[in-house]
């Protein structure tokens, strides 16, 4: 992975205005938390679809991520929609590892999520347009196993507490280390009944950023901390 400064992830600590904190007095690396059992073991599965070409993705004007248009064009070119369905169906009936507790799919656009709900019985969409109470109802049903798959569009990267969750599918490319870290974080919470979570990446993100254990905090000088992968 490239050593790129993603210090904006820690902006709230030492770079806020007004200046509340001036220094970080203690830090712990993710790899240490994994070794100590405070985070769940994660098995990483990079599964790019045949023909996927990251060179076709264009960077937006801010340089922060890929343009919607280029991502949609690549999806259409390789029929990414059918591939997502194929992968999720395989995960629902794995050849090894036992039945998954729940499958949370992260998509970039509504179209992929709709394709999943059309093809997989019981799959439900959660998006920014889903009313709060309806979202809470869906997630509670997901947690107790009444909903096997949740396809979420641009939400649930933070604030979703479900330690038993053992399968996350990242069905969207990103240049944002913060987003990648947050998405992996949905399945990294430890639970006594979870031996290891599965993180299935369909868009080259593992190759881009590495495993979460590869992330490390570093003081880049003048109290400005950054995250590197």
What are these regions (language model features)?
Residues 67, 219-229:
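Cys/His-rich short segments
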Residues 173, 178-182, 186-217:
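Conserved segment of the helicase C-terminal RecA-like domain
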Residues 1-44:
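Post-DEXD/H (motif II) to motif III coupling segment of the RecA-like Helicase ATP-binding lobe
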Residues 104-106, 112-158:
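Conserved helicase ATPase core of P-loop NTP-dependent helicases/translocases
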Residues 1-5, 32-35, 48-53, 111, ...:
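Conserved nucleotide-binding/hydrolysis micro-motifs of P-loop NTPases
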Residues 37, 149-169, 184-192:
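SF2 helicase motor core recognition
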Residues 21-23, 39-43, 121-122, 163-167, ...:
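Short glycine-/polar-rich loops that comprise or flank the Walker A/P-loop
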Residues 70-123:
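Conserved strand-helix element at the start of the C-terminal RecA-like helicase core
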